[in-house]
């Protein structure tokens, strides 16, 4: 499989599966290491805050440009309709104001905030399409208040320690304190894992913030999916180059992720792009 093909780091995504399955996979990697006298790094990727819509009665709806659509933090979880859907992150109305732009499902759906009415976010659809259950929500330009480390992440850090992970990646850090907290929790759990900061929030790009994040981390990941949605795709290539240069200048490794060689999912050779 991929181990024989020469992979040198395995990423375990805490957004999926459970502790038992994660530990079983890692045991397979460690067994392969011993049998082949090699080293394969184990990177365990924390899920981070889930800022998502809830689900629809019919699992999906088709939104058209100009439609009025409401995100309602008090709507029951599975009762979304053509005109409204619940949200898992109950603080979202407090983070927004009229004129904000929300991007759903990695930017496929674009909503303009018209008004905040208590628990309801009233919006107009600027870019429509099919919206299905549990899709992510981003705020153009950043500014959502969700903490980078959730209670689930803190539990998963103990799993990473149990698995003797080599690296732990923290999702959506806003400042260096998020990295320091992750390192502290790892140390308390008995882990020597190095911490990787996934750069995917607009706030993390500020000069003083990104420099301190890089200093506190063993390496960074340019998470082009969420970052591109927050800052806009036209800004992404320049920021990607900037982050790579900053990491190298500080003697930190850097991973560039999301849609890298994606064509090779279905093709044995990459495109020229």
Roles of regions detected by a PLM:
Residues 1-273:
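Non-catalytic helical/linker scaffolds that mediate oligomerization, partner binding
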């Amino acid at each position: 499989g991929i181990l024989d093909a020469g992979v040198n780091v395995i990423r375990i995504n805490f957004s999926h599966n459970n502790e038992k399955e994660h530990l079983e996979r890692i045991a397979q990697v460690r067994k392969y290491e011993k049998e082949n006298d090699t080293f394969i790094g184990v990177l365990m990727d924390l899920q981070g805050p889930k800022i998502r819509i809830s689900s629809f009665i019919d699992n999906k709806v088709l939104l058209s440009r100009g439609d009025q659509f409401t995100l309602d933090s008090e709507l029951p979880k599975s009762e979304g309709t053509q005109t409204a859907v619940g949200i898992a992150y109950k603080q979202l109305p407090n983070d927004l104001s009229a004129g904000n732009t929300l991007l759903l499902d990695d930017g496929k759906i674009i909503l303009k905030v018209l008004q905040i009415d208590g628990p309801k976010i009233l919006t107009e659809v600027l870019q429509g399409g099919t919206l299905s259950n549990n899709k992510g929500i981003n705020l153009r330009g950043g500014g959502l208040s969700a903490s980078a480390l959730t209670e689930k992440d803190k539990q998963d850090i103990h799993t990473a320690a149990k698995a003797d992970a080599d690296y732990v990646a923290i999702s959506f850090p806003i400042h260096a304190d998020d990295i320091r907290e992750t390192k502290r929790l790892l140390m308390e759990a008995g882990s020597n894992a190095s911490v990787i900061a996934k750069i995917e929030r607009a706030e993390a790009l500020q000069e003083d913030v990104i420099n301190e994040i890089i200093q506190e981390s063993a390496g960074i990941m340019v998470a082009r999916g969420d970052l591109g949605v927050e800052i806009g795709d036209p800004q992404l290539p320049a920021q990607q180059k900037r982050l790579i240069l900053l990491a190298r200048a500080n003697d930190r490794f850097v991973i560039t992720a999301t849609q890298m060689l994606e064509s090779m999912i279905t093709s044995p050779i990459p495109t020229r792009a």
